[in-house]
């Protein structure tokens, strides 16, 4: 683990806050170059603290902090951009992704591409968005997250034979292996998907409801497998799960 003495103007997003002592906050931050870190924002809960309005979700910050231990001291914080995410589904999506980052990543383990994708997600969720658009953004982020963590999913080829996935064939998805063709008349069984839906997911085309549902199930199976016993609490609050 990297022990940081002092860092200035590091790009970061707030992914979780909680009260600390009488007037301070403990803040989980996802930074561009240092990964996920924890800081103490002293006095941030005071009514006149300038930190109150900037330590919020979907805000791109430039932070300065210091400390050798795992818990750093936040010395300064500048708001670079705030992405207005007001629609309930979009806001819940950010809450979901924030919890996913906490559960899936290790502290002080840098992932620049995940940070960039997170920023793109915030940009994409800002303003009015249709459910389909939001689901495409979420599935894209989940795929990149797993890929960057070393758990990428091949949506084009079978894992054992190496054959191309074909639209009319059916495939069993094993999160530890990938997709492999099966002989069955049903795709209702958990873990079995139609090739067409897998390929649509691969191309980012989720206009068909069956493909959207399949992509969501694939990612849930993969994430649950790699998270192990770290269940995502936000799921029970999301609508139409």
Residue ranges: model-predicted function:
Residues 1-25, 30-241:
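Non-catalytic alpha-helical scaffolds and adjoining flexible linkers that form interface surfaces
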């Amino acid at each position: 683990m990297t022990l940081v003495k002092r860092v200035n103007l590091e790009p970061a997003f707030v992914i979780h806050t909680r009260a600390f002592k009488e007037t301070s906050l403990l803040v989980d931050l996802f930074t561009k170059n240092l990964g996920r870190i924890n800081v103490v924002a002293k006095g941030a809960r005071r009514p006149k603290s300038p930190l109150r309005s900037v330590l919020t979700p979907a805000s791109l910050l430039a932070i300065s902090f210091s400390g050798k231990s795992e818990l750093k001291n936040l010395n300064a914080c500048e708001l670079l951009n705030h992405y207005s995410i007001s629609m309930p589904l979009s806001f819940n999506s950010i809450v979901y992704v924030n919890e996913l980052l906490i559960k899936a990543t290790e502290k002080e383990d840098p992932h620049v591409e995940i940070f960039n994708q997170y920023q793109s997600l915030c940009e994409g969720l800002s303003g009015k968005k249709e459910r389909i658009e939001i689901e495409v953004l979420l599935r894209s982020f989940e795929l990149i997250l797993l890929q960057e963590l070393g758990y990428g999913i091949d949506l084009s080829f079978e894992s054992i034979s190496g054959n191309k996935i074909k639209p009319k064939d059916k495939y069993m998805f094993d999160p530890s292996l990938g997709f492999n063709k099966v002989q069955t008349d049903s795709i209702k069984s958990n873990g079995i998907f139609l090739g067409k839906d897998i390929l649509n997911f691969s191309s980012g085309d989720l206009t068909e409801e069956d493909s959207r549902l399949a992509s969501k199930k694939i990612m849930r199976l993969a994430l649950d497998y790699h998270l192990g016993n770290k269940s995502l609490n936000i799921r029970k609050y999301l609508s139409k799960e």
